[in-house]
């Protein structure tokens, strides 16, 4: 069993009770994946909702400063502190909600327990009155091939780090440097 990747130390600290909260940045899963592998809550908030001042970016459009906690309630409290605003519930009843669920690509390779949990959640939302509509998004099948030679985050990372690499390439970890 592995504890995850990027923020796995923070995830283990929270999961074992050594820390109340683990802070980090999340671009493509650095908070959510270790949280999932350690059985805790990882919450990626809306981009630019929490200031990232002082953080070295991987992706200027996708990076978020966020947290891992042991419960959803704790995640809400920490998020409210980080974002300096209260989390409010939507005043609209669920019967007025219309949610689209992609029926292609995104759900294709889910592990069976994850797929069951996802569909149970959809059923719960339906019973609560939400209108759930499955929609095909055939163009998403092209995402993998489109990103074979890099993604938005790779391009943004290269643009941000290029001036530093020109001056201080030897100070970068070689593995990080090659990825940029």
Question: Which positions does each model-derived feature cover?
Answer:
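Short glycine/serine-rich loop segments
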Residues: 1-79
């Amino acid at each position: 069993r592995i504890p995850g990747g990027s923020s796995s130390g923070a995830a283990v600290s929270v999961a074992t009770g050594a820390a109340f909260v683990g802070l980090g940045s999340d671009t493509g899963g650095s908070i959510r994946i270790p949280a999932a592998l350690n059985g805790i809550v990882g919450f990626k908030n809306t981009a630019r909702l929490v200031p990232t001042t002082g953080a070295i970016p991987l992706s200027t459009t996708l990076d978020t400063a966020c947290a891992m906690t042991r419960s959803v309630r704790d995640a809400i409290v920490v998020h409210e502190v980080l974002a300096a605003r209260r989390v409010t519930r939507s005043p609209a009843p669920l019967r007025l909600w219309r949610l689209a669920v992609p029926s292609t690509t995104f759900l294709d390779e889910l592990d069976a327990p994850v797929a069951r949990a996802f569909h149970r959640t959809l059923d719960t939302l339906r019973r609560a009155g939400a209108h759930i509509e499955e929609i095909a998004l055939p163009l998403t099948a092209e995402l993998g091939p489109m990103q074979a030679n890099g993604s938005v985050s790779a391009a943004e990372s290269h643009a941000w780090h290029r001036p530093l690499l020109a001056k201080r390439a030897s100070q970068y970890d070689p593995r990080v440097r090659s990825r940029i």
